[in-house]
């Protein structure tokens, strides 16, 4: 199934955090926090401004982004847990 977000929404798949600390301590699943990074899988066309023109999105498919731990709405698609959120919920794009 392919999703096409509407307006200024993006679809993000969470990227799992490391399960081991820098000193080698393994973090159990029960203590692990929700990841706050993800990969953009799809982007909407953009948000309409006051003049009715569509403002282009600042992110593109494949970008790695930072967001709040509780941002977006979780949806399950073909067994994958994805997030649908507004572009405004994104904090930054991780540059390589």
Curated annotation (Swiss-Prot):
GO molecular function terms noted in the UniProt entry: ATP binding; metal ion binding; protein folding chaperone; protein-folding chaperone binding; unfolded protein binding
Database matches in PROSITE patterns: CHAPERONINS_CPN10
Cited Gene3D superfamilies: GroES chaperonin
Superkingdom field: Bacteria
CDD domains the record matches: cpn10
UniProt keyword list: Chaperone, Cytoplasm
GO biological process: chaperone cofactor-dependent protein refolding
Function: Together with the chaperonin GroEL, plays an essential role in assisting protein folding. The GroEL-GroES system forms a nano-cage that allows encapsulation of the non-native substrate proteins and provides a physical environment optimized to promote and accelerate protein folding. GroES binds to the apical surface of the GroEL ring, thereby capping the opening of the GroEL channel.
NCBIfam families given in the database record: PRK00364.1-2, PRK00364.1-5, PRK00364.2-2, PRK00364.2-4
Family stated for the protein in its record: Belongs to the GroES chaperonin family.
Subunit structure and binding partners: Heptamer of 7 subunits arranged in a ring. Interacts with the chaperonin GroEL.
Annotated HAMAP family: CH10
Name of this chain's protein: Co-chaperonin GroES
Source organism per UniProt: Albidiferax ferrireducens (strain ATCC BAA-621 / DSM 15236 / T118)
Gene: groES
């Amino acid at each position: 199934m392919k999703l096409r977000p509407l307006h200024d929404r993006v679809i993000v798949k969470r990227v799992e955090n490391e399960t081991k600390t820098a000193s080698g301590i393994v973090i159990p699943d029960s203590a692990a926090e929700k990841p706050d990074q993800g990969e953009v899988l799809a982007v909407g066309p953009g948000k309409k401004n006051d003049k009715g023109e569509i403002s282009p999105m600042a992110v593109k498919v494949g970008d790695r982004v930072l967001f709040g731990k509780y941002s977006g709405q979780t949806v399950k698609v073909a067994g994958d847990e994805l997030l649908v959120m507004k572009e405004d919920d994104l904090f930054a794009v991780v540059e390589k």
